[in-house]
From Swiss-Prot:
<protein>
    <recommendedName>
        <fullName>Hatching enzyme</fullName>
        <ecNumber>3.4.24.12</ecNumber>
    </recommendedName>
</protein>
<feature type="binding site">
    <location>
        <position position="293"/>
    </location>
    <ligand>
        <name>Zn(2+)</name>
    </ligand>
</feature>
<keyword id="KW-0732">Signal</keyword>
<comment type="similarity">
    <text>Belongs to the peptidase M10A family.</text>
</comment>
<feature type="compositionally biased region" description="Low complexity">
    <location>
        <begin position="334"/>
        <end position="371"/>
    </location>
</feature>
<dbReference type="InterPro" id="IPR021158">
    <property type="entry name" value="Pept_M10A_Zn_BS"/>
</dbReference>
<feature type="repeat" description="Hemopexin 1">
    <location>
        <begin position="381"/>
        <end position="422"/>
    </location>
</feature>
<dbReference type="InterPro" id="IPR006026">
    <property type="entry name" value="Peptidase_Metallo"/>
</dbReference>
<keyword id="KW-1015">Disulfide bond</keyword>
<feature type="glycosylation site" description="N-linked (GlcNAc...) asparagine">
    <location>
        <position position="126"/>
    </location>
</feature>
<feature type="glycosylation site" description="N-linked (GlcNAc...) asparagine">
    <location>
        <position position="64"/>
    </location>
</feature>
<dbReference type="InterPro" id="IPR024079">
    <property type="entry name" value="MetalloPept_cat_dom_sf"/>
</dbReference>
<keyword id="KW-0068">Autocatalytic cleavage</keyword>
<keyword id="KW-0479">Metal-binding</keyword>
<dbReference type="InterPro" id="IPR033739">
    <property type="entry name" value="M10A_MMP"/>
</dbReference>
<comment type="function">
    <text>Allows the sea urchin to digest the protective envelope derived from the egg extracellular matrix; thus allowing the sea urchin to swim freely.</text>
</comment>
<dbReference type="Pfam" id="PF00413">
    <property type="entry name" value="Peptidase_M10"/>
</dbReference>
Length: 587
């Protein structure tokens, strides 16, 4: 009865807040958290077909974030007015055509407001919270329902980069010590080719004029930071355009920076007809430099196209964002050159991707052939930043900007950005898989992805795992349900409802922990049904999943060598990050 009373209390508080616009008391979040502990129910299938059931009354959203999202959709349905209806879990204002419901759902998923693959039970997904976020980001009245203003916003052409709330800038940037390079690939035929290039150059100057950056145009055959090209529908990066209208363009964050423009649009200059190339390009280059979308409607980084602006000027919001990353203008200016850059990328400390002038990010070779080149030395350090088994049972080891696919007789390698798409930083700290979702951790944020999604919502770790520190070292999820996060010599155990149960030393929680792991681990992964692998200093150790007992390998040793046993292609090529230097400019 006590639990029933708590449920009724919270439902009443939500009803009052929703209908009468009365703010919840300060104690409400803790009460709602307690309710989610009592009522959350989920049965997830892990990578090996095992299930971990718990009992309860309410079902969370598919990404398992609903306990932070406010009202449950079943409560919303009971409080709609006579001028509203509920269609497939979405509250719809009278006069808005029901066809907009599916458009809204697709939009919310595509741009990061709801988890991917949202074909779960309609009551599982809190569309009201997602709509409120969407309306806030679009700068329209926040009602939480599909009203006329929301339907109009859905039909407005926009940028294809997901909306990441509420953050303004990326944690990954270009260096200010040398120009950011750009080159031209395929261009639109809507304008004279020289005019296209002039509009692009003008778009770069927008950011050059107010920041500590400079830009250099280089031939398309050279190593380049930002490659500009036009294409239609499937244009080679795995993120297809949608024809005229809808998504106009998209760009990749540093250190992949490329900007792609939908050639199905009619690109124009200096006119209100068509789509203004200069303004869209300047917006996309904001992403290429590390800016996310802005909620300020007058800002260039507002996600929706607002038409041609004759006397365009950057908004103060845009200026503040770019200067927070790169400082103010030093007067270096944007230059154009037809010569190869004199600074070779491999001899600098610049945190960018490797040479990819003639490759496409979405195309990753995942098999090893006799003609495949030797792996880069940096990929052969023997140490991994993270190791993850994804929802398709593929195991990837991440090391700097590279990955190794380990679930093959002869492991293959490639760039992390090629395999996982844009929106995921390359400085990954840890990763694990739960059900259909793969989680990635970097600094104080987590990102998630499924097999059908390439975009990555960026969320503070403490929104989901309260009490978890930033910059974790490793993580794995037990087949029994708990998730173990590692930070220095400590391990944080969270239950299946993502509540912290215990913080203790690694040597205290597991049995017969090798002394080499007492001070911390580099990566952890559930390798198969029986064993968890722990990586540290070029070696890996194994522990039984159910008994949490470290055991020796058949040769009697407590560890196995990573290069000898896991990535033999690296024999003779091992090189630590610190000593990599500029040994091979092609890498």
């Amino acid at each position: 009865m006590a639990n029933s009373g708590l449920i009724l209390l919270v439902m009443f508080m939500i009803h009052v807040t929703t209908v009468h616009n009365v703010p919840l008391p300060s104690t409400a979040p803790s009460i709602i958290t307690q309710l989610s502990d009592i009522t959350t129910s989920i049965i997830e299938e892990d990578a090996f077909g095992l299930t971990t059931p718990t009992t309860g009354l309410l079902t969370p959203v598919s990404e398992n974030d609903s306990d932070d999202d406010g009202d449950d959709i079943t409560t919303i349905q009971t409080t709609t007015s006579s001028s509203q209806t509920v269609i497939s879990g979405v509250v719809v204002e009278e006069g808005v055509h029901e066809s907009n419901v599916e458009i809204l759902k697709a939009h919310l998923e595509k741009f990061g407001y709801t988890p991917p693959g949202s074909t779960f039970g309609e009551a599982n997904l809190n569309y009201t919270s997602a709509i409120l976020d969407f309306q806030e980001h679009g700068g329209i009245n926040q009602t939480g329902i599909l009203d006329a203003d929301t339907a109009e916003l859905l039909s407005t052409p926009r940028c294809g980069v997901p909306d990441v709330l509420p953050f303004v800038t990326s944690s990954i940037t270009w260096s200010r010590n040398q120009p950011v390079t750009y080159s031209f690939g395929a261009l639109t035929s809507d304008l004279n080719q020289n005019d296209v290039k002039d509009e692009i150059r003008r778009a770069f100057r927008v950011w050059d004029d107010v920041s500590g950056l400079s830009f250099r145009e280089v031939p398309d055959t050279t190593s380049v930071d930002i490659r500009i090209k036009f294409g239609s529908y499937d244009h080679g990066d795995g993120i297809s355009f949608d024809g005229r209208g809808g998504v106009l363009a998209h760009a990749f964050l540093p250190r992949n920076g490329d900007a792609h423009f939908d050639d199905s649009e009619t690109w124009t200059e200096g006119t209100r007809s068509g789509t203004n190339l200069f303004q869209v390009a300047a917006h996309e280059f904001g992403h290429s430099l590390g800016l996310y979308h802005s909620t300020v409607r007058s800002a260039l980084m507002y996600p929706y196209y607002q038409g041609y602006v004759p006397n365009f000027r950057l908004d103060n919001d845009d200026i503040a964002g770019i200067r927070s990353l790169y400082g103010s203008n030093s007067g270096s200016g944007t230059t154009t050159t037809t010569r190869r850059p004199t600074t070779t990328r491999a001899t600098t400390t610049r945190r960018t991707t490797t040479t990819r002038a003639t490759t496409t990010r979405a195309t990753t070779t995942t098999t090893t052939s006799p003609s495949r080149p030797s792996p880069p030395r940096r990929a052969c350090s023997g140490s991994f930043d993270a190791v993850v088994r994804d929802s398709s049972n593929r195991i990837y080891a991440l090391t700097g900007p590279y990955f190794w696919q380990l679930d093959q007789p002869s492991p293959s390698w490639g760039l992390v950005s090629n395999r996982f798409g844009f929106g995921l930083p390359q400085n990954i700290d840890a990763s694990f898989q739960r059900g259909v979702v793969t989680y990635f951790f970097s600094e104080c944020y987590y990102y998630y992805q499924t097999s059908t999604q390439r975009n990555f919502p960026r969320i503070p770790v403490n929104r989901k795992w309260v009490g978890l520190p930033c910059n974790i070292d490793a993580v794995y999820r037990s087949s029994r349900g708990p998730t173990y996060f590692f930070k220095d010599s400590f391990v944080y155990k969270f239950n299946s409802n993502n509540r912290l149960q215990r913080r203790t030393r690694i040597s205290s929680l597991f049995n017969d922990v090798p002394s080499a792991l007492h001070d911390g681990v580099e990566a952890v992964v559930r390798a198969d049904r029986n064993y968890i692998h722990f990586y540290r200093d070029g070696r890996y150790y194994r522990m039984t999943d159910y008994g949490r007992q470290f055991v020796n390998f058949p040769n009697g040793l407590p560890y196995s060598d990573v290069i000898e046993s896991v990535i033999p292609q690296c024999r003779g090529r091992s090189l630590s990050y610190e000593s990599e230097g500029c040994s091979n400019s092609s890498e």
